[in-house]
Swiss-Prot record:
A GO term from the CC aspect: extracellular region
Main location: secreted
Expression sites by tissue: Expressed by the venom gland.
Lineage: Eukaryota, Metazoa, Ecdysozoa, Arthropoda, Myriapoda
Protein name: U-scoloptoxin(08)-Er5a
Taxonomic source organism: Ethmostigmus rubripes (Giant centipede)
Length: 167
């Protein structure tokens, strides 16, 4: 039976009732002692609460940074697409204005379209490569963060265990 009780007398009552009902045996007294130690040490409670709050803030900050990065990348891609559309329209206008020979213009148009298709294909390949690299870096960063957080938590638990063992 595990509980995190803010009122030690209520916890004691819960443990006693559980003992009477046969749910808790020898561990009941240990749990009462642990709860009482936690209740007596408000400084320790405050440190644990602060650590939890700092961890939550850090996670929120990491998430906002990632969202900001994604938004900037989308805006850059949109601006690049708009620039390409403007170039295309300007080229079309010049072709219509300078159209002397119909066949020559059609050939130039086809050549330009082929060039644009190749550029778009190359750009798409490059964007996919960059996206894959970005996703991999994000995964590595998140994995490293989780490993560090786990190690910090483990060392904090060991430290708390040693401090409680001295009592």
């Amino acid at each position: 039976m595990k509980t995190n009780c803010e009122f030690p007398l209520l916890c004691l009552l819960i443990v006693l009732v559980a003992n009477v009902e046969g749910e808790v045996e020898d561990t009941g007294l240990k749990m009462v002692k642990r709860l009482w130690r936690n209740w007596e040490d408000p400084e320790q409670r405050q440190l644990l609460d602060q650590g939890t709050e700092l961890e939550k803030q850090r996670e929120k900050r990491l998430w906002r940074n990632w969202e900001d990065l994604e938004l900037r990348q989308l805006l850059n891609e949109f601006a690049e697409n708009q620039r390409e559309k403007r170039l295309w329209r300007n080229w079309e206008r010049r072709q219509v204005a300078n159209e002397d020979d119909g066949e020559k213009a059609k050939e130039l148009w086809r050549n330009w379209e082929d060039l644009k298709r190749r550029q778009v294909a190359d750009l798409n390949d490059e964007q996919e490569t960059q996206r894959d690299k970005r996703l991999w870096r994000n995964w590595e960063d998140n994995h490293a963060t989780l490993r560090k957080r786990s190690a910090d938590s483990l060392s904090r638990q060991k430290r708390l265990g040693k401090e409680r063992g001295k009592e």
